[in-house]
Design a protein with these regions (language model features):
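Glycine-rich phosphate-binding loop of actin/hexokinase-like ATP-binding domains
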Residues: 122-179
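Glycine-rich phosphate-binding loop and adjoining helix at the ATP-binding site
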Residues: 25-125
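Short, surface-exposed charged micro-motifs
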Residues: 3-5, 101, 158
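Gly/Thr-rich phosphate-binding beta-strand-loop-beta motif of the actin/hexokinase/Hsp70
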Residues: 1-24, 128-140
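Hydrophobic beta-strand positions
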Residues: 15, 68-69, 139, 160
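A mobile "lid/hinge" subdomain adjacent to the ATP/sugar-phosphate binding pocket shared
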Residues: 65, 176-214
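Hydrophobic "anchor" residues
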Residues: 22, 76, 145-146
Length: 215
């Protein structure tokens, strides 16, 4: 199975066997996908490239997709920070085009499943939090993924923490993502750097330390 972590700007690729052991090299790709069709095309190209590396194997797809996903129909309902607002029938379109089995789910759900299958601690209840350009989470309760109504559970990134804060991509103000996601932290770092003397010599590794010492 070719496992892909898909966002509007990148795809992470890893082939794995039925025991979830990695096969071949991990790959990180930056992509330019201005439309749903362009995103599907990038996924197809990635699959064809790996298919050539394993010509004697059936390479199915497992897609971890950011945003709200219907795992039954395989539809990406919303993908935050994507330049489109329409749902994408990912599973149907890729299965028709490639002639393989395609599994689609939310990226945080996939992280929780991996933790459940790979962790030997036998914990029955836990939460996985994914901090990227957004913030998401997934809950495992009594060893089962908690999905909630309309598969919208775990959207903690859109919990309002500052009603007077900056506008979020979801249209509301002061969501957690606007202050604690990687994209928000990068923006805050750029603003802080501009307030420093011109001759300040800083690199990303020392930035956190310098900011902490200031306080």
């Amino acid at each position: 199975t070719l496992c892909l972590n898909v966002t509007p700007t990148s795809i992470e690729c890893q082939v794995a066997n039925a025991c979830l052991s990695p096969k071949g090299e991990f790959e990180y790709l930056q992509i330019d996908a201005p439309t749903p069709q362009a995103l599907l095309s990038e996924i197809e190209k990635c699959w064809h490239r790996h298919r050539k590396l394993w010509p004697d194997r059936t390479i199915n797809l497992a897609l971890a997709i950011h945003g709200q996903v219907d795992p039954v129909t395989g539809v990406s309902q919303t993908m935050p920070q994507a330049p489109w607002a329409t749902p994408i029938e990912v599973k149907y379109l890729l299965e028709e085009k490639l002639g393989i089995r395609v599994m689609v789910d939310n990226d945080c759900v996939m992280l929780a499943l991996a933790e459940k299958w790979q962790n030997n601690s036998q914990v029955r209840d836990f939460c996985v939090i994914n901090v990227d350009y957004g913030i998401g989470s997934s809950f495992v309760i009594n060893e089962q993924i908690y999905r909630g109504s309309l598969y919208g559970r775990g959207q903690i990134g859109h919990t309002i923490v500052n009603p007077d804060g900056v506008v979020c991509d979801c249209g509301r103000y002061g969501c957690l993502e606007t202050v604690a996601s990687l994209s928000a932290l990068k923006k805050q770092a750029r603003v802080w750097l501009k307030s420093q003397p011109v001759n300040t010599q800083l690199n990303p590794e020392k930035l956190t330390t310098a900011r902490s010492e200031e306080h």
